Amino acid sequence: MKVLFFNSPPFFLAHGGMQTLTEALMRELAGLGVEVEPERWWDENQKGDIIHYIGRPVALTVRAAHQKGFKVIMTENLGQTASRGWKRRFAQRALTDLARRALPGGFLDRLGWEVYQELDAMVYVVEHEWETAKYLFHASPERGHIIPHGLEPEALTELARPQKPEDYLVCMASIYPVKNNVLLARAAQLAGTPIVFLGKPYAEDDSYFLEFKQCVDGKVVRYAGFAAGEDKNRWLRGARGFVLLSQYESGCIAVYEAAAAGLPLLLTDLPWANKVYGQVPAAKFVGLGPPQRIAPALKRFYEQAHRQASATFPLLTWRQVAARYLEVYRKILGGA
């Protein structure tokens, strides 16, 4: 079995969870005996059995792949769409259905809506995103699969190690508006709640990053930059709790890492969080709003939060995740 991977946008333009997923899948699938390669757009002689798109391809591409004998699978992030209110999603479905009837087929192909009926398999990290795909785009119900992200076994072991607790909360996320880093920093200042931010911007001269740095005072709000390996693990193990006020997420790996460290969670009261972690006893939720509205909830969370001796919720290794993808590959190849 040979699988070709395609990721858009490319990693040099946007780092994040989908890069981590792609790299982990290619590595772990190879360990399970699957031949993997990146899709070589310049190589007209490249061969394979499956094309795995990380992100939505256009229908014309899927049809061309089928004509060449490939099966096609997509892993899609619908976090933003799935976090919209039901009224907006209802209106979007109505407009989408109207456009399907009114617009010519070639135009619809460019929008990518028809791809949900033509893919051999679709994978989502969380259930509510798959439900959104079926609701909005009439995705074929029998072709959907829910496979969460994972972590390295070494990371699970290292994050679970005991460490002397310190008095701070931690937020680990890229520094850009979707993550609401500035909002959280200002709320922490109002609450007098010490917090450490880990992460990097998409550009050092980005205006949002510059605004964020103005909130850093080195006392209540600290910024440790991008952290990896033991440096990241140390910050997580020493924290009282983990906070993330994103507008949307899709199986956020930072949340998984915080859970592996046994940290209680304070997350946005939006579907990406409350529908996924709503049954987790150590998870709390706060609605988005101005800093003065968030500050009291942040202060209460800080006062009550303490690291647990075990993971906040069950987690998989990347090898286990890859094994689930391999089951899907075999299914669409007819049990090969």
Positions of predicted regions on the chain:
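Acidic anion/phosphate-binding donor-loop and adjacent secondary structure
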Residues: K134-Y135, E142-E166
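Aromatic "clamp/platform" in nucleotide-sugar-dependent glycosyltransferases that forms part
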Residues: Q247-Y248
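Membrane-proximal helix-turn-helix segments that form the acceptor-binding/catalytic region
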Residues: D97-M122, E131
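A charged, aromatic-enriched C-terminal amphipathic alpha-helix characteristic of glycosyltransferases
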Residues: G17, E303-G334
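Short, structured helix-loop element that forms part of the nucleotide-activated donor/catalytic region
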Residues: Q19, P194-V221, D231, W235
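Conserved donor-binding/catalytic core segment of Leloir-type glycosyltransferases
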Residues: P162-K179, A185-G192, V196-L198
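Conserved acidic donor-binding segment of nucleotide-sugar-dependent glycosyltransferases
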Residues: A283-P291, K299-E303
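Short hydrophobic beta-strand element within catalytic cores of glycosyltransferases
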Residues: P264-L267, N274
